[in-house]
Amino acid sequence: MSAVSSSRTWRTFLATLAAAGAFGLVLLAAPSDAQTATEKETTAAPSETTTAAVRPFRANVPDEALVDLRRRIKATRWPGGETVGDLSQGVQLATLQELVRYWGTDYDWRRAEAKLNALPQYITTIDGVDIHFIHVRSRHPNALPLIMTHGWPGSIFELLKTVGPLTDPTSYGGRPEDAFDLVIPSIPGFGFSGQPTGTGWDPDHIARAWVQLMMRLGYTRYVAQGGDWGAPISGAMARQAPAGLLGIHLNYPASVPPEIDRAIRNGDPAPAGLSAAENAAFEVLKNFSAKGAGYRAIMGTRPQTLGYGLADSPVAFAAFIYDYNGGEPQHSLTKDEVLDNVTLYWLTNTAVSSARIYWENDNKSNTSASVQKTEEISLPVAVTVFPGEIYRAPKSWTQRAYRNLVYFNEVDKGGHFAAWEQPQLLSEDVRAGFRPLRNQRSS
């Protein structure tokens, strides 16, 4: 795609993007011939990735977009405050106002943009949709290719802290033989990837697209990893068992047995005979289903209706995103980290297109073993359980769900956004989980 001059008016720029079918409010430009220092250190020559089907990408949002964002923030009409002293009604007014004050005055998107542009990024078109991805080749020989998928309300930003530990383990206390070549795509409808104009982009379709992506990059043996939506997408890849895929690692497994899933959906008490760990998981899942899954219901049934407000008000969208990290992401992430993610959604106008993955998934559970058809997975599966996850998957359930479970570990800190919150810990477990597969030949 040709570069667009940032001197054009914001209105003209939007019209140009709409006519070209581009994705949201981003500016694309091919990188200069000279790589950044980071690119030189972390990846092989661009020619190893760039082909006729794979184009270099750099983000450069027009100044007008950032001016417009601050104008909208300044014009916010705030609601009244909550009538309780806790988070039971959602994000507290004072908390959000503090975040938004920073967003509208001191937050610097250009810093976030530079962080992305320090890494090799590309665009390729698969099944008519542009797929944006980061591709970092390890400096270590015999690195194992790994495709890693984000979730909602996350983005590629949630995975960036793992790039160093996974591609250059010796700089982070690891061994050279544990190195990965890392591919981090943006899910269709998210970030800089294209927004599908038709239906059918469910996790199975995305999984097939990821297989095409790895083939297009020349990888004949590789592994996959994911949490949140990255988990069912990686699980779908394992069910499809394409030639070259050696195994998967999940930090949000679909371990919930059918009888547990059924009891939760029906509002029944816990089945008899559960262990302490199983009963604890049941109670957490039951509470989440009753009080924490409202976002899934609305996005799974009416994403378009929801999107009108979220696409028009940055503060409304920020509140929606903020709420789904327990309403307190500041305990594990900095303000800048929270806002990097929120601002990426805003600038690419992907509130609706990202929500649509829930509709495409027919509002199905991503934690149910039967719904996710884990019985069809014969490839090796590694699982890491984080204590702050939506539920702590018991080993007994996970062994039952995945017949070829080769690695299971419970760690002592971290939550749903494991790669963001505990990148070193997750990276160490990804290394350990895939270590037995490194010398394995693909099917």
Model-derived segments and spans:
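Non-catalytic accessory segments flanking enzyme active sites
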Residues: 66-137, 142, 337, 346-349, ...
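Glycine-rich "HGGG/HGxG" loop immediately N-terminal to the catalytic nucleophile
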Residues: 109-111, 174, 187-201, 235
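Conserved alpha/beta-hydrolase
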Residues: 166-192
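Conserved hydrolase catalytic core segment
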Residues: 165, 169-172, 219-269
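Short beta-strand element of the alpha/beta-hydrolase
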Residues: 143-151
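N-terminal targeting or regulatory segments adjacent to alpha/beta-hydrolase or S9 domains
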Residues: 2-115
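Conserved acidic catalytic loop of the alpha/beta-hydrolase fold
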Residues: 204-222
